[in-house]
Structures are given as structure tokens and as C-alpha cells.
């Protein structure tokens, strides 16, 4: 059973996150291993396995990027374990330039410039995310997979910038 079906949701990117949360809580209560403490060893093991599946499904579907990756996996794109990388040289060059800029910001410890950088990267991420949503809505799986790969780059860059921000604030 796929994760969307487990939570009673349609297999699409845009989901009702409130319904996801409520169903997660219901499933947690229903399959919590403590409820099977007096059951047979097989029942206890099944409850632990079901609980682990529910938790994994929840973690996957609640985050936009992992939800997109999972949806794409249902359509034959295994992005989680693939060796395929972004082939868009302009995008890759832009990423190198942004990484260099982040390094410069770190060297200069310029928190004002860092704040502007983070906002810029967030705008780039949001624009790509919107592009991906449209691609998934239109079942443009190849294009959506490529956009997810690019979003991974931007997500890592954003994370690096936020870590630098914490480092500069602690300094």
C-alpha cells in the first residue's frame, strides 16, 4: 500500500495537510505498539512494523520535497537512490556562483549581506517549487524530476546559509 492510500489521500502533490495530520494521529493511536503489549509475539512485531511504516509515511508526506520525490517514485522515478544529476549547465554555474558568494559572506562575516542572500535563495526555491507543483499537476514527470533535483541544490544551499546565520549570531 502506498503512503497516500495509507493516509486516505489522493496520490497527488497538493494534499490536505490538516487531514494528513489528523489521520496520522488516528493511525498512531490505532497501531501503537503499547496497545499490543499483551498480544502474541507476532502481533507485537506486526504492530512495531506498522507503526514504523506509519511514521515513515508521515515524515515523507509532510515535507514538500520528500512528498514530491515519493510521488515521482510512484511514477518510476527513484530520485532517492539515483546517480542522475542536474545537466543544466547554466543552473550549475549559478549554483557555483552562489556557493562562492556564500563563502565570501562567511569570510567577511557580513550578516546584512547574508540576510539578503537567504531571501534571494528562498525566492529562487519558491519559484522552482511553484514550477514543480505545476509540472506534477500536469503529470510532466520528467520535467518535475529535473526540477526536484534542482530544488535539492537550492535546499542544501538554503540550509548552509541558515547554518552560517546561526554561526554568525553565536559569534
UniProtKB/Swiss-Prot annotation:
It holds the Pfam family HSCB_C. GO terms for biological process: [2Fe-2S] cluster assembly; protein complex oligomerization; protein folding. Keywords: Chaperone. InterPro entries: DnaJ_domain, HscB, HscB_C_sf, HscB_oligo_C, J_dom_sf. Gene3D superfamilies: DnaJ domain (1.10.287.110), HscB, C-terminal domain (1.20.1280.20). One of its GO terms (cellular component) is iron-sulfur cluster transfer complex. One of its GO terms (molecular function) is protein-folding chaperone binding. Residues 2-74 form the J domain. Interacts with HscA and stimulates its ATPase activity. Interacts with IscU. Co-chaperone involved in the maturation of iron-sulfur cluster-containing proteins. Seems to help targeting proteins to be folded toward HscA. Belongs to the HscB family. This is Co-chaperone protein HscB. It comes from Salmonella paratyphi B (strain ATCC BAA-1250 / SPB7).
Amino acid at each position: 500500500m502506498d503512503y497516500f492510500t495509507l493516509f486516505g489521500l489522493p496520490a497527488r502533490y497538493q494534499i490536505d495537510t490538516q487531514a494528513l495530520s489528523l489521520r496520522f494521529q488516528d493511525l498512531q493511536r490505532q497501531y501503537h505498539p503499547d496497545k499490543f503489549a499483551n498480544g502474541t509475539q507476532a502481533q507485537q512485531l506486526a504492530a512495531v512494523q506498522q507503526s514504523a511504516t506509519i511514521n515513515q509515511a508521515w515524515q515523507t508526506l509532510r515535507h514538500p520535497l520528500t512528498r514530491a520525490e515519493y510521488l515521482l517514485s510512484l511514477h518510476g522515478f527513484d530520485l532517492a537512490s539515483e546517480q542522475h544529476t542536474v545537466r543544466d549547465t547554466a543552473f550549475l554555474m549559478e549554483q557555483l556562483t552562489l556557493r562562492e558568494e556564500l563563502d565570501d559572506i562567511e569570510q567577511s562575516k557580513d550578516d546584512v549581506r547574508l540576510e539578503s542572500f537567504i531571501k534571494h535563495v528562498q525566492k529562487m526555491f519558491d519559484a522552482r517549487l511553484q514550477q514543480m507543483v505545476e509540472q506534477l499537476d500536469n503529470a510532466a514527470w520528467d520535467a518535475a524530476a529535473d526540477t526536484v533535483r534542482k530544488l535539492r541544490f537550492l535546499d542544501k544551499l538554503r540550509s548552509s546559509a541558515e547554518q552560517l546565520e546561526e554561526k554568525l549570531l553565536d559569534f
